[in-house]
């Protein structure tokens, strides 16, 4: 996922980000901070410049605003995110809209809308029975009457104070916003759409891949090294995009600490689960499908012990880089309940701990970027690490190389 690094250097620092966070938003727009002088590049032990790991605003700045709203994306850019992440699902009339899943009662006010009460239903999505309201049962015009709300109001009450202000955006609106934000801040801001539940949507006649390619084409982003990358938890649709549907932008294959891609499940393939794709053979298969980057859960890189503390570094990054794949893990969140125990600030699960400190060993392990709900803290983490690289050029070669772990 090198597209943004190839286009522009960062134009923000943590101080400007902190100002952006503290300022309330009466409207989705976020005032542009003054562009500071870019920090000097760090160097490796060989004296070569070290690429700056990319910060991806996960669902926007979703630690501060309701996720997947234009306001969340604007704030992510203001805080210094290199890339913003819209998750894509389809409407009944085939429009790509931005939600983390097609089940929308957790992130919109649809359950409080009596005119849509009869749309509540139960469906099986990726083998799981779900009850609620689904995007594919609404036209775009109907979805636009809804308003977004915070997914975790008890954890993020400040974000919940913005409930009811923002619409559900379309993917096209996010692409248009990306262009405006890039012009506003004088740097290319990347976009990394995730195609959600591709096997399911294909099964109901609402395949999204073709429209993704069309929109990237229309916005000049369907080319190598463009500030755009397409991601999926399934490999089959990424292969189809690369081999048959004309996608030229880079791709990311996402994985998890357990389970299997649903395309494998649907095909009855009991071999190609997410564990398989952590092996050298699995990664070579991913690369052969034309994929550029792996997006694992961060616990696939440094494990989590049973007591919640940080465990051992795995061979994941080393194997991926050997296969020609970059590594961009998800999702770093600042609240204690999402951190390894040694980085928690207190027993309060909703208080913020030391996310900046927790990210450091992952950067040392050699990751190429990361997803975070708190882009301002993500930028601070990278700034801290880059300064450490300048002062200690040998830092961050990855423990896997030092330990000589065997390749599976």
What are the residue ranges of the model-derived segments?
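Phosphate-group recognition and catalysis centered on beta-loop-alpha active-site segments
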Residues: 2-14, 22-408
């Amino acid at each position: 996922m090198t597209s943004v690094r190839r286009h522009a250097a960062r134009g923000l620092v943590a101080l400007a980000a902190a100002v952006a966070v503290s300022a309330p938003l009466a409207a989705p727009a976020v005032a542009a901070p003054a562009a500071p002088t870019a920090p000097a590049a760090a160097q490796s032990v060989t004296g070569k410049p070290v690429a700056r790991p990319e910060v991806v605003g996960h669902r926007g700045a979703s630690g501060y605003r309701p996720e997947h709203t234009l306001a969340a994306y604007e704030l992510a850019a203001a805080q210094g995110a290199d890339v913003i992440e819209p998750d894509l699902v389809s409407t009944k009339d085939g429009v790509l809209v931005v939600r983390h899943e097609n089940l929308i009662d957790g992130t919109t006010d649809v359950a409080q809308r009596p005119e849509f009460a009869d749309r509540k239903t139960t469906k099986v999505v990726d083998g799981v029975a779900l009850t609620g309201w689904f995007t594919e049962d609404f036209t775009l015009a109907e979805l636009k009457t809804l308003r977004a709300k915070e997914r975790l109001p008890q954890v993020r009450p400040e974000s919940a104070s913005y409930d009811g202000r923002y619409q559900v955006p379309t993917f096209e609106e996010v692409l248009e916003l990306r262009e405006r934000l890039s012009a506003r801040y004088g740097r290319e801001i990347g976009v990394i759409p995730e195609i959600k539940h591709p096997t399911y949507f294909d099964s109901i006649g609402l395949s999204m891949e073709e429209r993704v390619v069309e929109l990237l084409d229309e916005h000049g982003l369907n080319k190598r090294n463009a500030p755009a990358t397409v991601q999926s938890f399934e490999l089959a649709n990424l292969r189809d995009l690369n081999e048959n549907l004309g996608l030229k932008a880079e791709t990311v294959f996402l994985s998890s600490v357990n389970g299997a891609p649903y395309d494998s499940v649907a095909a009855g393939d009991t071999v190609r689960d997410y564990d398989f794709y952590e092996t050298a053979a699995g990664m070579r298969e991913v690369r052969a499908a034309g994929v550029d980057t792996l997006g694992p859960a961060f616990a696939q890189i440094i494990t989590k012990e049973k007591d919640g503390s940080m465990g051992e570094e795995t061979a994941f990054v080393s194997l991926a880089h050997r296969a020609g794949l970059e590594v961009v893990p998800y999702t770093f969140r600042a609240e204690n309940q999402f951190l390894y125990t040694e980085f928690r600030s207190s027993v309060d699960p909703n208080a913020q701990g030391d996310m900046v400190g927790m990210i450091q060993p992952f950067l040392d392990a050699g990751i190429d970027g990361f997803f975070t709900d708190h882009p301002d803290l993500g930028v601070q983490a990278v700034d801290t690490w880059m300064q450490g690289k300048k002062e200690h050029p040998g830092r961050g070669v990855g423990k896997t190389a030092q330990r000589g772990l065997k390749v599976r």
